């Protein structure tokens, strides 16, 4: 990556809006299968890095997409009428409480652009989604990282951080949390929201809510006007390649977000696919059952290998590569897995140098992972 100084000199006489943008590193996605094939010549690849649905998407989605093929020259419905109607019914909210996005990342960005300025602050937890810090830097704002508690959110400390920083405009909470998989209970979240000034937006990032439906905090919307819930169709619904998400909020907040979002920010194919996916809750139940079964199997395998892990409420698990194991730190294991066609996720960007995040796959992929991991650890 280029240094801040070299990037700045290369830009001149152009100058970015905020100096903090120069400190940003481009977001690193999970390594694509195609990239691994190019680099290592491996054709049989198992990707367990990006928390995608290993069984794909609902068959109803395929039909819905096919029906849109003849309409690709036409712009989509910019308001997403039919998808919003379906989401309103599903979540028991009014249509005017919904904002659609090009994935949930788009909505997080819209929220930051709508509410955060250069003199403001964004509060978030250590070991929470790295994009939260990036959003603060993009806005030239202060990013306030609160130390984690048992790899999860320390709500009392976060409340104190908001009190200490009166310029706080947004506090982000991922529940279940990415990348650790920890979960907050509804009661403690409600108590936290009640402690936050009404001028601070509490954004609940529920990208993995389908894997932990008991942590659904939809009821908070009825009680607090400063709560926004952001969800995605990229994970359990299996539409990561189409990019579609949604936000639930008060009508007033949604009105503002819809003023800021780009026109036609969700494609016609994505709108149709998301509506079809939402209608097939049997598929979501199947997804959840497979995930639970395979998660339990993986936990037993990690125990047998002597590897620690954090109990997860999502579709991934964070695994510790023991520090005392010579030449087997996470970076070494990550590279060795790549060379054998298995992609997982490094967590160095979070400061978790001895941990890997592993998505839960289907049985065949999980067995391939464990066999490869066992072979690497044994050889070392």
From Swiss-Prot:
CDD domains: AAT_like. PROSITE patterns: AA_TRANSFER_CLASS_2. Keywords: Amino-acid biosynthesis, Aminotransferase, Histidine biosynthesis, Pyridoxal phosphate, Transferase. The modification N6-(pyridoxal phosphate)lysine is found at residue 235. Pathway: Amino-acid biosynthesis; L-histidine biosynthesis; L-histidine from 5-phospho-alpha-D-ribose 1-diphosphate: step 7/9. Pfam families: Aminotran_1_2. Gene3D superfamilies: Aspartate Aminotransferase, domain 1, Type I PLP-dependent aspartate aminotransferase-like (Major domain). It catalyses: L-histidinol phosphate + 2-oxoglutarate = 3-(imidazol-4-yl)-2-oxopropyl phosphate + L-glutamate. Its EC number is 2.6.1.9. Belongs to the class-II pyridoxal-phosphate-dependent aminotransferase family. Histidinol-phosphate aminotransferase subfamily. HAMAP family: HisC_aminotrans_2. Homodimer. This is Histidinol-phosphate aminotransferase 1. The lineage of its organism: Bacteria, Pseudomonadati, Pseudomonadota, Gammaproteobacteria, Moraxellales. The gene is hisC1.
